Amino acid sequence: MHSRDLIEQYKSYVQDWRRYFHKHPELSNEEFETTKTLAKELESMGVEVHVDTERGIGLIGIIRGGKPGKAIALRADIDALPVHEHNTVDYKSETEGKMHACGHDGHMAILLGAAKMLMSMKERIEGDVYLAFQPAEETGAGAPDFIKFGDWYDKIDAIFGGHVWIDLPAGLISVEEGPRMAASSQITINVKGKQGHGAQPHQAVDAIVVSSAIVMNLQTVVSRNVSALDSLVLTIGNIHSGSEWNVIPGEAKMGGTIRFFDPDQEEYYVESIRRVVEHTAEAYGATATLEYVKKVPPTINDPASSELAERVVIDTLGKDKLSKMRKVMPGEDFAWYLQDKPGCFAFIGIQNPEIEATYDHHNNRFNMDDTVLSAASAVYAEYAIQWLQEHK
């Protein structure tokens, strides 16, 4: 039996689970009931389940194959977002202010479907398949924390995962090699000037003016310090300074993010930003410091894993379902798994204008065409089977 033969059989199963999870969202590091539900369903299939009992969130399922061999992990993230849903569907979130607005409900359903398929094809599995249901992806720290849970990560030899993607038409899948999602880092800039009277600016060092100059000068990091052939996004998302209408503030704080694909350029990018921040402030008689926090590295598919994934998509769904898609600037903590293990991260098309599945991820109207999710389940299952068969 081939995974493609099970797509229709589990179509409703996967769709129903996606809608169940959509109705019952839980935020990052709060996925207690979600974890219990997943564990119960996997155990009902006969999957070996290991829950992170210390935290009560996240679990590893293990499917032991009919023959000995290596181990591969299939991963799904399980957290929702603090978003008030504005959809009117009958599976709308039942929890006020919480919503699966990024598609992780679909990821869980896809992996449950893959588990069902794998359990019915155990004779084809030459090794072990680990099912990694990871909490807290939205924090950026979910994967590093989950890697520390037990010894599952040490035991696997490769990993595969994916993200439903609203910019890709439903039914298409993209698995190209190389950078697929950007590194995501947080920057905080603290400016210190000199507070003064609003009528006497010459006796003060205006932190707002200094901050404004820093923001403007930072634009040259991208336009004049980075090659036009490289990709860097530098965004300042907030500025906080002052509280009175007639007082020149002496302090300001700014927050932002940088996104990039080449990890070898990270140090250069950070130092370029630091130089602009510090010297701009100095030119105005102020001081400024840069705090840099690395959230996730870039998600980079290795060539061999992507080549296998392309073959699997064509073999399972047909050549017309394999799509090419440009890399994207959002970050994904799946990247942490790829630091030490070979793997591939797929984009799974869910866009369908006929059902208004066109709103962007994190939007309060986000939705997906979930009729195509069982096809993704088949790709997950078949990738695991074929990877194990080719790496005896």
Model-derived features with residue positions:
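A structural signal for isolated positions on well-ordered beta-strands in alpha/beta enzyme cores
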Residues: H50, Y130-A132, T289
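Metal-dependent amide/peptide-bond hydrolase catalytic core
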Residues: S212-K392
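Hydrophobic beta-strand positions in extracellular immunoglobulin-like domains
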Residues: I63, V191-G193, I258
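Non-cysteine beta-strand/loop elements that form the S-adenosyl-L-methionine
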Residues: A73-R75, H84, I187, F345-I350
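Histidine/acidic-residue-rich, glycine-tolerant segments that coordinate divalent metal ions
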Residues: L59, L81-V83, N87-M99, D105-G106, ...
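Hydrophobic face of alpha-helices
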Residues: V14, S28, F32-A39, L111, ...
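Acidic/His- and Gly-rich active-site-bordering loop/insert found
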Residues: M1-H100, A109-I125
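Divalent metal-coordination and catalytic microenvironments
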Residues: F21, G61, L74, H104, ...
